[in-house]
């Protein structure tokens, strides 16, 4: 069994991570640490886990007791944690924050998008788990980027559920504002753009990214279009070839809906050609393929396990 610890255990991503790990056949959770919830029962915060576990949030931890550490703290806190703790030489770390995703700040962390870096991830000790928007958009465009077929402006509209804003309610995330409502935020400036442009190796000024707050809890529905000389048959073949060995990214010949991926680690892509424009739909669960599910996928890879272990999940399709 692989002994794991979690830092920052009170949020949505940590709650989903705990849910996945307690059902993972190769995992023993040693501690879940949370400053704000220390000594409370985990099921009192993550109420969906009632009957599944009896652990409490710890107020202390020993990194020498674990093999893998998941960092689920706020952006900025992971870097501070690494700087202020002695990390034993065998400890593997998977960070779910933004702190080590960019190349200039990586500090030995490998960018953990398996569809891009799977073989590098297998050999890595430290993983920077990608952002949710970044995951959806990169998976929509990677096959084109790797064939050097991105040659014009890219237009992206992506709508996300309220859980993407975190567990603490804000003026734009609590129910009475979010329900029956929709709004644009961080147009052209979203922090995930840098991840996207670095991985795709494409000029940042050619991305037109409009993130949208949706009136639902979870999931990302991204639409992407760009000019392309490919006909639809060739485009679908390029995508099918690229994702042929992917454990979780699939091409659908039918226009997908968000419920097909909610509660799963899947990304479903759909392609259409309209005149000279290639149109791509990319859908994921922001808390799973966009966060905790992808973290477990990376955990499996760095631990030499089957990539899909613990991630056979049923979609909320009905």
UniProtKB/Swiss-Prot annotation:
Tell me which EC number(s) this protein carries.
1.2.1.38
Pfam families, per this entry?
Answer: Semialdhyde_dh, Semialdhyde_dhC_1
Q: What is its main location?
A: cytoplasm
UniProt keyword annotations, A-Z: Amino-acid biosynthesis, Arginine biosynthesis, Cytoplasm, NADP, Oxidoreductase
Molecular function as annotated in GO: N-acetyl-gamma-glutamyl-phosphate reductase activity; NAD binding; NADP+ binding
- Top-level lineage group: Bacteria
Q: What does the organism's lineage look like at the top? A: Bacteria, Pseudomonadati, Bacteroidota, Bacteroidia, Bacteroidales
Q: Where in the cell is it found?
A: Cytoplasm
The chain's disulfide connectivity reads none
- Gene Ontology terms: biological process: L-arginine biosynthetic process
Which top EC class is named for this enzyme in its record?
oxidoreductase
Q: What is this protein called?
A: N-acetyl-gamma-glutamyl-phosphate reductase
- Reactions accelerated catalytically: N-acetyl-L-glutamate 5-semialdehyde + phosphate + NADP(+) = N-acetyl-L-glutamyl 5-phosphate + NADPH + H(+)
Among Gene3D superfamilies, the record links this protein to: Dihydrodipicolinate Reductase, domain 2 (3.30.360.10), NAD(P)-binding Rossmann-like Domain (3.40.50.720)
Described purpose of this protein according to its UniProt entry: Catalyzes the NADPH-dependent reduction of N-acetyl-5-glutamyl phosphate to yield N-acetyl-L-glutamate 5-semialdehyde.
Q: Does the keyword Oxidoreductase apply?
A: yes
Q: Cite the NCBIfam families for this sequence.
A: argC
* Family the UniProt entry places it in: Belongs to the NAGSA dehydrogenase family. Type 1 subfamily.
Cited InterPro entries: AGPR_AS, AGPR_type-1, NAD(P)-bd_dom_sf, NAGSA_dehydrogenase, Semialdehyde_DH_NAD-bd
- GO cellular component terms given for this protein: cytoplasm
| Provenance organism | Azobacteroides pseudotrichonymphae genomovar. CFP2
**Which residues participate directly in catalysis?**
132
